[in-house]
């Protein structure tokens, strides 16, 4: 049985959201708590990327940040509900709020449209995907906003992977970047955050997804 993988437009949205998150990491202290767990050196590297490096790293074909998709206990509490607030009575959203709304909107519609693709893009469990799909978008957004939390870096406990992403993953050499990005994708597929024995690894092997590649950047002169 073949599963429908992410469409090219899904990958384009992933790249755009990754870029927005990486851009904000360079200047928004609100997101710094999401780097907890990374060594100081990696946090310093991640928050001091050049524009070119951000563009290269953002091309990783999965969300580099997480809403704790594998933490069922956390999301059970988040979705348990409380008094509903009027989303339109709050002050103007800042850039971090905009990132949260855009990211959750993308995740929510994908959970309803193609949950298998969501497994590839953010390692979401079946349980989490089903719970998210049951909500309206505004219910989901309001529930997460009520926690006061912000997205966190994915793979915070996989320090070697982040070292690879922040070295080879931002390299000018397309082959090196591609290898680092594939390593990240493999990690999402083989190391689910809650270590459940689900059938997602089988789905990943037979999924039909657009092919992507990383082209070599043109080098100025002989440098």
Residue ranges: model-predicted function:
Residues 84-102, 151-162:
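Membrane-interacting alpha-helical segments
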Residues 60-82, 146-190:
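Long, compositionally biased
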Residues 80-86, 109, 138:
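A short mid-domain helix/strand-loop element embedded in enzyme catalytic domains
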Residues 32-36, 43-46, 96, 100-144, ...:
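Amphipathic alpha-helical packing elements
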Residues 27-31, 81, 110-113, 150, ...:
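Surface-exposed polar/charged interaction patches
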Residues 5-16, 38-40, 124, 128-169, ...:
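Extended, low-complexity, amphipathic alpha-helical coiled-coil/linker regions that act as scaffolds
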Residues 165-223:
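Short, functional C-terminal segments
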Residues 1-80, 205, 213-214, 220:
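Structure-specific DNA junction-binding interface
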């Amino acid at each position: 049985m073949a599963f429908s993988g992410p469409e090219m437009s899904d990958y384009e949205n992933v790249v755009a959201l990754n870029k927005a998150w990486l851009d904000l990491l360079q200047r928004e202290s609100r997101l710094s708590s999401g780097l907890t767990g990374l060594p100081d050196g990696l946090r310093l590297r991640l928050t001091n990327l050049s524009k070119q490096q951000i563009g290269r790293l953002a091309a990783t074909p999965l969300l580099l940040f997480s809403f704790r998709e594998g933490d069922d206990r956390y999301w059970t509490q988040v979705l348990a509900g409380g008094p509903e607030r009027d989303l339109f009575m709050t002050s103007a959203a800042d850039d971090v709020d905009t990132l949260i709304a855009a990211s959750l909107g993308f995740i929510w519609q994908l959970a309803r449209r193609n949950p298998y693709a969501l497994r590839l893009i953010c390692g979401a469990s079946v349980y989490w995907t089903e719970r998210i799909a049951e909500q309206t978008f505004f219910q989901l957004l309001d529930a997460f906003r009520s926690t006061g939390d912000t997205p966190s870096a994915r793979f915070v406990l996989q320090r070697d992977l982040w070292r690879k992403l922040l070295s080879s993953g931002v390299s000018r050499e397309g082959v090196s970047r591609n290898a680092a990005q594939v390593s990240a994708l493999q990690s999402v597929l083989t190391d689910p955050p809650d270590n459940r024995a689900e059938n997602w690894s089988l789905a990943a092997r037979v999924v039909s997804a657009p092919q992507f590649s990383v082209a070599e950047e043109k080098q100025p002169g002989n440098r």
